[in-house]
Curated annotation (Swiss-Prot):
Record-linked Pfam families: LIM
SMART domains: LIM (SM00132)
Organism superkingdom: Eukaryota
GO cellular component: cytoplasm; nucleus
Gene Ontology molecular-function annotations: DNA-binding transcription factor binding; metal ion binding; transcription coactivator activity
The species this protein was found in: Homo sapiens (Human)
Keywords, sorted A to Z: LIM domain, Metal-binding, Repeat, Transcription, Transcription regulation, Zinc
Name the UniProt record assigns to this protein: LIM domain only protein 3
Residues of the LIM zinc-binding domain: 11-73, 75-137
SUPFAM superfamilies according to UniProt: Glucocorticoid receptor-like (DNA-binding domain) (SSF57716)
Length: 145
């Protein structure tokens, strides 16, 4: 967890070992840092600028994206079967995972908005219109999500 604190007396920076004379400093991993010294080991982004969370593993300090890229789990999209990188945002329906762009009705390709109902039939995502049409034609009843 990162915290920005006004400097009351000079402290030593864990990154460069110099005294911190700046107005603000970062505290992370129970150590103090210059804002410029607390960076991701992979992409060199300033961690104080990308959020209030950092990740550590294998003696590396990482941003969220690089942590997930290096140590996250990848999987395949249930709609297109292509790889979903570990750092990518996804949609889930039961045990299925989808790219955001693939999470649409698989009959009419209608994209869903927040709050829209969708239905599952044989692991197919259906909009309410296609679900109701199928229900009238075939009498099936997928689960509502």
């Amino acid at each position: 967890m990162l915290s920005v604190q006004p400097d009351t007396k000079p402290k030593g920076c864990a990154g460069c070992n110099r005294k911190i004379k700046d107005r603000y400093l970062l505290k992370a991993l129970d150590k103090y840092w210059h804002e410029d010294c607390l960076k991701c080991a992979c992409c060199d982004c300033r961690l104080g600028e990308v959020g209030s969370t950092l990740y550590t593993k294998a003696n590396l300090i990482l941003c969220r994206r690089d942590y997930l890229r290096l140590f996250g789990v990848t999987g395949n999209c249930a709609a297109c079967s292509k790889l979903i990188p570990a750092f990518e945002m996804v949609m889930r329906a039961k045990d299925n995972v989808y790219h955001l762009d693939c999470f649409a009705c698989q009959l009419c390709n209608q994209r869903f908005c927040v709050g829209d109902k969708f239905f599952l039939k044989n692991n197919m995502i259906l909009c309410q219109t296609d679900y109701e049409e199928g229900l009238m034609k075939e009498g099936y009843a997928p689960q509502v999500r």
